Amino acid sequence: MSTINKNILESLKGELKRQQDHIELIASENYVSDAVLQLSGSILTNKYAEGYPDKRYYGGCEFVDQIEKQGIELAKKIFNAGHANLQPHSGSQANEAVYRALLQNGDKVVSMSLDAGGHLTHGYPINFSGNNYDFKFYGVNRETEEIDFDEVRKVVLEHQPKLIVAGASAYSRIIDFKKFREIADEVGALLMVDMAHIAGLVAGGAHPNPMEYADVVTTTTHKTLRGARGGMILSKAEIGKKIDSSVFPGTQGGPLENQIAGKVQALYEADTPEFKEYVHQVVANSKAFAKALADNGMRLIANGTDNHLINLDVKNTLNVTGKDAEKILESIGIVSNKNMIPFDTEKPFVTSGIRVGTAAMTTRGFKEEQFVEVAKIIASALKDQSETNLNTLSKEVAKLCKQFPIYEHLSY
């Protein structure tokens, strides 16, 4: 078959139009470059390459070796890491590989609770991490909604974990990695940082680099780093062999060389002045967005943001669940996601909050002015859900999208 199946093609066209016509505020999403798109869909998808560069279990790997080697060196340079592995298929698999490399089943681990901003793979009971290891949790201060380091230290001293996990999927403030290191050293624990959300900010100098303090750092490559979908592990040189063995053959077989090429392209892009300008704009936009949301009567978790994301409490201020808020906003062309907030009493599929981010629309060209306008639209939609108001707001969203087009050259 030399053409795309018509049923798939119809959905593909629909998705292109959706991306073009919606304001994308999901904090974990971004728009990749044309080069990343090309590499992800390139002939590299045909190549099997179990193993690592120059140590493969298949022949014909000289060119994929070249690409992967470039990526390893770039990642080490950008993040000041002793070792880098680009093969994890996802952030979750990167986390799994690290756990398998450093822990035995049943070992104690301390991490951030899900409602405070942690991730499923940080010990949530229904996840493999919660099943295989003995996780204990820290959270945030009830007043400031920022990480409660007194609680972190208390939990760590009480349970004497082998590993401490810092990092989150919904935390809007700078994380003090130095404090985590100091607490880890009190009990001789290893420190892992999951920087999936902030990797691009770290690469561009808009957030402190966790490699300065962590033994190992995991990340996705498709959020603020703006690369092909996948994962990556950075570590101190002395544990590099353990990490590599845990990825292959421990948890994966053949790597996705097309996706690795897309990751490497993104790393090349991240190592430029233009990318540094981009991530600083992401943070500037986020701060302006947060202020405008607050000015329009929205309650911000942790009273603001230092990175690309903002968590909003919609249930306790507007009497709208996160689930309903997500639907209301999507009906006018704004895409966000329902999200738990600290001490949330709602179920994870309902939630009291929503999470929004600035990475994707900053890629599209939005500056502070546009995010102030979006904040007003969001507040208006959640406060007045009348058909007349939502229709008016939908037109405003469409106008903004038209002013900042994306992927105009693509046609399917």
Curated annotation (Swiss-Prot):
Q: Where does (6S)-5,6,7,8-tetrahydrofolate bind?
A: 114, 118-120
Instruction: Indicate where this protein is primarily found.
Output: cytoplasm
Q: Which residues cross the membrane?
A: none
Which metal ions or organic cofactors does this protein require, according to UniProt?
pyridoxal 5'-phosphate
Top-level EC class as recorded in UniProt: transferase
Site, as annotated: Plays an important role in substrate specificity: 222
Q: Which residues carry this modification: N6-(pyridoxal phosphate)lysine?
A: 223
* A Gene Ontology cellular-component term: cytosol
The cross-references to InterPro entries, in alphabetical order and at most eight, read: PyrdxlP-dep_Trfase (IPR015424), PyrdxlP-dep_Trfase_major (IPR015421), PyrdxlP-dep_Trfase_small (IPR015422), Ser_HO-MeTrfase (IPR001085), Ser_HO-MeTrfase-like (IPR049943), Ser_HO-MeTrfase_PLP_BS (IPR019798), SHMT-like_dom (IPR039429)
User: Which Pfam families is this protein grouped with?
Assistant: SHMT (PF00464)
Q: Which reaction does it catalyse?
A: (6R)-5,10-methylene-5,6,7,8-tetrahydrofolate + glycine + H2O = (6S)-5,6,7,8-tetrahydrofolate + L-serine
Q: Which UniProt keywords apply?
A: Amino-acid biosynthesis, Cytoplasm, One-carbon metabolism, Pyridoxal phosphate, Transferase
Q: Which GO terms describe its biological process?
A: glycine biosynthetic process from serine; tetrahydrofolate interconversion
Disulfide bond positions: none
GO MF term list: glycine hydroxymethyltransferase activity; pyridoxal phosphate binding
Q: What is its EC number?
A: 2.1.2.1
Q: In which pathway does it act?
A: One-carbon metabolism; tetrahydrofolate interconversion; Amino-acid biosynthesis; glycine biosynthesis; glycine from L-serine: step 1/1
Subcellular localization, as worded in the UniProt entry: Cytoplasm
Record-linked HAMAP family: SHMT (MF_00051)
Record's NCBIfam families?
PRK00011.1
What does the sequence similarity comment in the record state about its family?
Belongs to the SHMT family.
Q: What does this protein do?
A: Catalyzes the reversible interconversion of serine and glycine with tetrahydrofolate (THF) serving as the one-carbon carrier. This reaction serves as the major source of one-carbon groups required for the biosynthesis of purines, thymidylate, methionine, and other important biomolecules. Also exhibits THF-independent aldolase activity toward beta-hydroxyamino acids, producing glycine and aldehydes, via a retro-aldol mechanism.
Its subunit composition reads: Homodimer.
List the protein's name: Serine hydroxymethyltransferase
